[in-house]
Amino acid sequence: MKILKNDAYIRALLRESVDITPVWMMRQAGRYLPEYKKIRAQAGDFMSLCKNTQLACEVTLQPLRRYPLDAAILFSDILTIPDAMGLGLYFTTGEGPKFHFPIRMKADIEKLPIPDPEKELRYVMDLARTVRKELAGTVPLIGFAGSPWTIATYMVEGGSSKIFSRLKAMLYTEPATLHLLLNKLTQTVILYLNAQIQAGVQSIMIFDTWGGVLSGENYRIFSLNYMHQIIEGLTRENEGCKIPVTLFTKGGGQWLEAIAETGCDAIGLDWTTDIGEARHRVGDKVALQGNMDPAVLYAPAPIIEKEVASILGAFGKGTGHIFNLGHGVHQDTPPEHVRIFVDAVHRLSKNDAASG
């Protein structure tokens, strides 16, 4: 691999020394950018955009043209896997993702294929290869997948949900059936992420968006257990370099110690967890990513800078911090406020490094 011109993100994940705190944003390529809206209109619909290599590459790179971000992340979706399994993913305005063929019984799970990432999901691999070439070693490229539990919530509910009644009914009344689904998804995610690594991504993130709706015991059994299996199955080195892995469970602040035992390199935090307390709890076992409330970006510059300084101060001196939001950037965020945010992270963390 060519040496990265900016490897601060990778170095921070591996808890190596950095001159500044690296920063990127979940959903950094997306609807808050006017240039994204133009490409989306050109593509027609969301999945058509995801499956068009050139347009998806353009969208992936758009935020890096605007802001001095320290990493790029593939423009894709966690539901590419169930779509490739034949569930018929579609999006409705104002309602989010839905499936034509949701999982309703054990027989539905048994007939699910495990997709070949270089066939049914080749468009994601083509995107990774194309973006790596276009980045030309400027910053690292992040690949990702949803956690098995989170993907399962959409497959069983048939779309988004607030109470997860169908999936939780399966969990309590047919746990073996749910484990069958989670095992199949785990195999699929391992193949999918390893293919992304072979295609050129330099870091992996696993999004466990809905792990936080589980009780502590069920989180360990039905979510964390499978993410642990994924980490054990991943290629952890490619092109002579380590491939760091970040786990992000939204609402998972109470389980940091258990997450740190999975073998991940970093834990993503939402804004409900104090990053200083999190660092105290996990010690030097893992790096931490986060964790500003995305809503702060609605505020004027002095408040954004104050929040950035507060989080940097709470984390304290030393490496192992990747600055991010506690969840994805909101679609109505003013783009100029993102510039204020990114610049503040770099400026204030550089000042800390100089005085540390």
Curated annotation (Swiss-Prot):
Subcellular location, record wording: Cytoplasm
Keyword vocabulary terms for this entry: Cytoplasm, Decarboxylase, Lyase, Porphyrin biosynthesis
Superkingdom of origin organism: Bacteria
Cellular component terms per the entry's GO annotation: cytosol
Gene Ontology BP terms: protoporphyrinogen IX biosynthetic process from glutamate
Alphabetized CDD domains for the sequence: URO-D
Enzyme class (EC, first level): lyase
Site (Transition state stabilizer): D77
Protein's pathway: Porphyrin-containing compound metabolism; protoporphyrin-IX biosynthesis; coproporphyrinogen-III from 5-aminolevulinate: step 4/4
Residues reported to bind substrate: R27, Q28, A29, G30, R31, D77, Y154, T209, H327
Record-listed E.C. numbers: 4.1.1.37
Pfam families recorded: URO-D
Catalytic activity: uroporphyrinogen III + 4 H(+) = coproporphyrinogen III + 4 CO2
Gene Ontology MF annotations: uroporphyrinogen decarboxylase activity
PROSITE patterns: UROD_1, UROD_2
Subunit note: Homodimer.
Function: Catalyzes the decarboxylation of four acetate groups of uroporphyrinogen-III to yield coproporphyrinogen-III.
Family classification: Belongs to the uroporphyrinogen decarboxylase family.
NCBIfam families: hemE (TIGR01464)
Name of the featured protein: Uroporphyrinogen decarboxylase
Provenance organism: Hamiltonella defensa subsp. Acyrthosiphon pisum (strain 5AT)
